[in-house]
Amino acid sequence: RAADDAVLSLHLADAESVRALAGACLGHNDCVLYVIAAGYMGVSRMTPGVREYTDSIRCRPAVYASAEELPLAGVQVMMASGNVSRAVAAIRGGGLALDYVSSDPGVIDITPRGVGKWSALLELCRMEGIPPENVAAAGNYLNDRDMIEHAGIGIAVGNALTEIKALADIVLQHDCEHDAIAELVDKLLAM
C-alpha cells in the first residue's frame, strides 16, 4: 500500500489452494491458520496465544469452522502457527499454488506462489524506475532473506538470526524497537 492507503499491487491466493490448506489445518488443535483478505481476518481456532497476538495488532478475527466460511476468492496472505508442519505438508504434498517461509519460531507466512517481500520490492522498483541495486532492505528473519541477499544494501537489525547477519552488507547493533533507524542513518552518513 502507498502512503495514501492506495493498493499498488495485489496478488491473490488461488481459491482451491486456500480451501485445501484450510481443510488440512481445521480440526487439529495443534495448528492455527490465519487467513487475511480485504476487510477480513479469520483464524481456524482461538487460543490464548492467538488472542494475545490479535490484541497486539488491534484486530478481532472471525473464527471459521469450515473453508466455505472464508472469502476464498480474495485471500491475500495466510499465516500458520503452532504445528506448522501440518500446513507445510499440505502445501508440499498437495501441490498447492502457495509459497511459505518461516517468519518467527513456530510461525510461517503463506503467500500466493512467487509472492514475497523481495518480489514486492522488485515490483515497486519497476513501478518507480529504481534499479534494485539502488535499494536498501532491512530485516531479521528468514522471510527477509531474499531482500537482504539481493538488495543493493542488505541490512540486518540487531536481533536478526545469525544466518541473516551473515548475508547482510550492514549489521546493526540495535533492533527495530530500539533505535535501529537512527543507527542506520549514522552508518549510511559515515559511508
Spell out what each predicted region is.
Residues 10-11, 54, 149:
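Short, flexible loop segments at the rims of nucleotide/cofactor-binding pockets, characterized by
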Residues 18-20, 24, 28-138, 142-145:
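Conserved acidic, metal-coordinating active-site core of Asp-based
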Residues 109-191:
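Mg2+-dependent phosphoryl-transfer enzymes with acidic/Ser/Thr/Gly-rich catalytic loops
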Residues 3-19:
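Glycine/small-residue-rich loop that forms an oxyanion/phosphate-binding "nest" at active or ligand-binding sites
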Residues 3, 44-46, 87, 147, ...:
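Short glycine-/acidic-enriched loop or helix-start segments at secondary-structure transitions
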Residues 9, 13, 79, 173:
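Catalytic cores of large soluble enzymes that bind and process phosphate-bearing ligands
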Residues 6, 47-51, 90-93, 151-153, ...:
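Short, glycine/charged-enriched secondary-structure capping and boundary segments
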Residues 3-5, 69-71, 103-104, 149, ...:
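Short glycine-enriched loop/turn motifs at secondary-structure junctions
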